[in-house]
A protein has these predicted regions:
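Negatively charged
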Residues: 1-132
Length: 132
């Protein structure tokens, strides 16, 4: 298991992609993503992880990702039980600000135990590309 730092200090634009991929029991993620790097690529940041807790759910955090890639950020994860509403609302704010929706495609692809996400994952949802 990788030790999660207390802050984003030390992360650069070149090392955010897959930074925590395939980790287990990530329970000490910083409660705030304040100071996260302005990376153009957060793709697969937590892909394949299990037991993720402590993911910030504030709308503002997710809106701040701007046009950075968050493709497959949580793909193939298990036990994602955090409330998706602030995340999705933040992503919606980002997209309504002119940023492209495709940068979040497959964000939750292959995930299991998405008990709070069914309304967002439906084929008719504007968020459906995040789940396929």
């Amino acid at each position: 298991m990788k030790k999660i730092p207390d802050s984003w200090e030390g992360f650069t634009a070149s090392n955010c992609n897959s930074a925590f991929a395939n980790c287990t029991s990530l329970t000490d993620i910083p409660s705030s993503w304040e100071g996260k790097p302005s990376s153009p690529n957060y793709a697969s940041l937590f892909e394949g992880c299990t037991s993720l807790t402590g993911i910030p759910t504030a709308q503002e955090v997710w809106a701040e990702f701007g046009n950075a890639s968050i493709v497959r950020m949580f793909a193939n994860c298990t036990s994602l039980t955090m409330d998706p509403t602030p995340i999705m609302d933040g992503l919606n704010r980002r997209e309504s600000g002119g940023y492209s929706a495709h940068i979040g495609s497959q964000m939750f692809a292959g995930c299991v135990n998405l008990q709070h996400y069914s309304e967002y994952a439906s084929p008719t949802s504007v968020y459906s590309s995040y789940f396929i």
